[in-house]
Every structure is written in structure tokens, then in C-alpha cells.
Amino acid sequence: MNGILLVDKPVGLTSHDVVEYVRKLFKTKVGHCGTLDPFASGLLVLLIGEATKLSSFFTQTKKTYIATMQFGIKTDTLDITGKVQLRNNIFIEQNEIEDCLKDLKGEVELSVPIYSAKKVKGRKLYEYAREGIDIEIPKIKSIIYSIEMINYCYPYMTFKVECSHGTYIRSLAEEIAKKLSTVATLVQLRRAKNGVFDIKAAFSLDFISEDSIIPLENLILNEIIVNESVYKKLINGNPLTRKDIKEIRLNDSLFEDFYKISMKDAFFVYKREGDKFKYLLKVENYR
């Protein structure tokens, strides 16, 4: 049981709750490719079994979200779960919002929410917040590839954003409000895409089974053909060079740097790095 599982996380559960549920269900190791806050819903990409070794490669991908923010209210957590700190009745025209969103495309610098797991001086930011300790809030650079308004009915505005990994949508909503000279908080958040994976292919927790898992051999389509003399290199996890390779079959552009090698009932995954191919993992008895 080695592959990827796409889960539609419901509101209220932590990402850890979902990982633990799946781990107990399948009795194997489970990892993830990016968490969601408890109040958020949507796509969680889970790595099952040996696929957990690919976590770092799938985490650094673009994310797409559908978010709803409420103007005229500010909370300490920057979302609807927090304590209200400020209210106003400033009305924002739709064209003002549209112009603001256009200006946000590209690289932006966003403050990290004080109620987040981001570590500063060895401690999570939310620990400082809960203890009332003042700390300098770090900023992170994010890339907004696209952002568009889906619906606006004051005080609520729903938008769709495609952004780089690690982008805090709560902070993005705060930045939108600042540029419009008002305040706002996030009231709804749903992840629609994580890299090439789409929420449309995800399963709710009630309908997960072994058949829901996308096997690694079905996910990675590019293939390397080698002679049996190279088998020892594969078993030992050694890198491969072009002279070790008999044939390269390019069947996929989504995971263009990843290749599979099938030999003696074992399945190996390699990643192309320049002129060499780096060993990533092995799955035995996969057929």
C-alpha cells in the first residue's frame, strides 16, 4: 500500500486528525503535503507507505484556494474563530476591490499570523500570543500567480487565488483590507488544488478505502529501462548515470523529473538531477 490519497478535509478537524484517522485505517505510515487550519476545508494530499519519502518534492507546489472574507471586522487570529478586536462600517466599492486584487499579483510580503505554528526563537508564534508576550512578527515572501473576485455582497467578498506554498490566506485577506483602508477577517477557506491534484478527485473520510489510493506506479509514468547488471545499484540506492540506462520512456509532463524502474517484482523511483538520476525509494512486491 504505497501511493497518494486525496482527502476532502471537513471543517472542524485538524490535518493531524485526518492523518491519524487514515494511519489507523490502513495501519501504515502516512504523511502529508501541506496542512489546513481546522476552520478550513478542502484538499489534503496524503502520502501512504513508501510514498512518504516524496513529501519534500510534493510540498513545494502551487496551491489554489477559494476564500471568503468579511469586511468591517478584525479578529486576533485573522479568521472567524478569533476574538473581535475592531469593527467599522466602511463600505468598499466593487471596483476598488477589483483594482486592489490586480495590484496584488506577483511577489508580495505578508506578515505571518500571530496565531500560527511558525517558529520564532524556538517557539511557535501562537505560544507567545496565548501568553501575551510581545514578539516581532516575521514576514514571508509569497507569489500570487492569479487572484480574482468570485462574488461580492458587502460585507462579504469571495475570491479565488493561486499562490506559492506557505502563503497564509488569512494574512492575504488582512493585506487586501489594509490596501482598502479598512479591516477584515477570513470567514471561510477551501483548498481547491495542490500542485497537479484537484479537490474534484478527493474522497470524504466516510468513503475512503484502499481503492481510493493512487498507486505510485500509476502516478509516475516516465520509465527507465536498465540492464540486469544495474540491479545491484538499484538495491543499494545508488545514483544512475546515462551509461547505466538502456532506454528512457517519456510518458508524462506533470512529473517530468520523476522516473520509475520495474525489475524483479520491485519498483524503484528516481529523480532526474542534471545528467544523473537520484534514488528516492523502493517498493517491493508491488504487483
From Swiss-Prot:
Pfam families to which the protein is assigned, alphabetical: TruB_N
Name of the top EC class for this enzyme: isomerase
Lineage: Bacteria, Bacillati, Bacillota, Bacillota incertae sedis, Caldicellulosiruptorales
Protein's name according to its UniProt entry: tRNA pseudouridine synthase B
PANTHER family: PSEUDOURIDYLATE SYNTHASE TRUB1, TRNA-PSEUDOURIDINE SYNTHASE
One GO term (biological process): tRNA pseudouridine synthesis
Family: Belongs to the pseudouridine synthase TruB family. Type 1 subfamily.
Cross-referenced Gene3D superfamilies: Pseudouridine synthase (3.30.2350.10)
SUPFAM superfamilies hit by this protein: Pseudouridine synthase (SSF55120)
Entry function: Responsible for synthesis of pseudouridine from uracil-55 in the psi GC loop of transfer RNAs.
GO MF annotation list: RNA binding; tRNA pseudouridine(55) synthase activity
Active site: D37 (nucleophile)
InterPro entries: PsdUridine_synth_cat_dom_sf (IPR020103), PsdUridine_synth_N (IPR002501), tRNA_psdUridine_synth_TruB (IPR014780)
Keywords: Isomerase, tRNA processing
EC number, as in UniProt: 5.4.99.25
Chain ranges passing through the membrane: none
Taxonomy, superkingdom: Bacteria
Recorded catalytic activity of this chain's protein: uridine(55) in tRNA = pseudouridine(55) in tRNA
